[in-house]
A protein has these predicted regions:
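Bacterial N-terminal signal peptides
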Residues: 7-20
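Cleaved targeting-peptide boundary
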Residues: 23-31
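An extracytoplasmic/periplasmic, membrane-proximal ligand-sensing/linker region
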Residues: 30-32, 222-224, 228, 241, ...
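Short loop->beta-strand "edge-of-pocket" segments that line small-molecule binding or catalytic clefts
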Residues: 32-42, 146-163, 203, 226, ...
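Ligand-binding clamshell of periplasmic/extracellular solute-binding protein-like
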Residues: 53, 75-77, 92-105, 125-127, ...
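Hinge/capping helix and adjacent helix->loop/strand transition within the periplasmic-binding protein
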Residues: 59-63, 83-94, 103-199, 249-257, ...
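A ligand-binding cleft/hinge motif common to bilobed small-molecule-binding domains
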Residues: 100-112, 167, 171-176, 204-249
Length: 341
């Protein structure tokens, strides 16, 4: 066999192998069931996004598997993150939807972290967790002027230490702006915090505005709940008159705490991730499926109807942000640790 023929045979062989591998992946998900493990309670923002994905993402995964949503609450989604890292099989059939802010928790040595967040196989995110703080009308406080003048601390609910999007926002705002706040933590999700606020157990709470405006829509429209503060770099288009937290920061340190304690982690808060060791080809199939889903007209229409904003984050961008957290200046991390834990 001369060299030209040998090269041709080799090329054909590799083409057959490649086609077989591609066919294997396209067939892998056929007839299978994928689980999304949500770290928060049913009825909240994380849960709503996961259930939307379960309805629309299968059409963009070869083999069109069924996708089911399971809620595993506890410790601000820490229990679910630990489960995905340590228990879930790395077979491409289970991924988690939990707080990516645990990257900060790991750097700061929070107890209960049983994973290295850098080793998760990231899929990305459908939305960012850019937050607003809302208080009930019954609390008697409907403006920042009233809040700064309050004689007693305002009770704000959070899901738990390390749960970025609720806990970090409340604690950083309290420290940076010297606001009278009493943190009431331990709620299983935003749905539970809504109920607590409406019953008078707490005065208000915070989570991503793009989720809040959909899941707390009736109370916001009726005026029984009022947004008093935005914790984002720029105002949301539909909240042009609500002030920004950073505009009340009186020192460079206060601004830095808000920037790195709230703004920076917002893109990784609503993490979607697979267990370490998941085959790369299966992860790529799911990443592509996710990217196609967020562009799907029916998915977008459902999100619009529910008033849930979409702001996709790629797996690569998420990993870069996580890696960046591990490179933050030690002095800043020490200050944040003293505030958050």
């Amino acid at each position: 066999m001369n060299n030209a023929v040998l090269r041709l045979v080799t090329v054909i062989a590799w083409m057959i192998i490649g086609a077989g591998a591609a066919l294997g992946q396209s067939n892998f998900y056929e007839g299978k069931t994928i689980r999304i493990i949500v770290g928060f309670s049913p009825g909240g923002g994380y849960d709503a996004l996961a259930r939307m994905l379960s309805r629309h993402m299968p059409k963009y995964i070869p083999g069109h598997p069924t996708i089911l949503v399971e809620n595993m609450t506890g410790a601000g989604s820490l229990l679910s993150a630990n489960y995905i890292f340590n228990v879930a099989k790395p077979d491409g059939l289970t991924f988690g939807h939990f707080s990516g802010g645990f990257a900060y928790s790991q750097v700061m040595g929070q107890p209960g972290i049983e994973f290295d967040v850098r080793k998760f196989v990231f899929l990305g995110a459908v939305a960012r967790d850019e937050s607003a703080i809302a208080l009930t009308k019954a609390s008697g406080i409907t403006s920042m002027e009233q809040w700064f003048a309050a004689k007693t601390p305002v009770k704000l609910g959070t899901t738990g230490p390390g749960a970025f999007g609720t806990d970090n926002v409340v604690k950083v705002v309290k420290a940076a702006l010297n606001l009278p706040i009493q943190v009431i933590s331990g709620y299983k999700g935003t749905a539970d915090m809504r109920l607590a606020a409406e019953s008078g157990e707490i005065d208000g709470t915070t989570w991503g505005w793009d989720s809040m405006r959909g899941t707390w829509q009736k109370a916001l429209q009726s005026g029984t709940v009022v947004v008093v503060l935005q914790t984002v770099p720029k105002p949301f288009p539909d909240l042009p008159k609500v002030p920004l937290a950073i505009d009340f920061a009186k020192t460079a340190e206060a601004k830095q705490l808000i920037e790195y304690g709230i703004h920076y982690p917002s893109k990784i808060t609503k993490t979607l991730a697979l267990p370490p060791g998941t085959p790369n080809d299966r992860a790529q199939v799911l990443r592509k499926g996710l990217q196609e889903t967020v562009k799907d007209p029916e998915f977008i229409a459902e999100a619009d109807k529910a008033k849930i904003g979409l702001a996709p984050v790629t797996a690569d961008d998420m990993k870069k942000t996580v890696d960046g957290i591990f490179k933050l200046e030690p002095g800043l991390l020490a200050k944040l640790k003293a505030i958050l834990f």
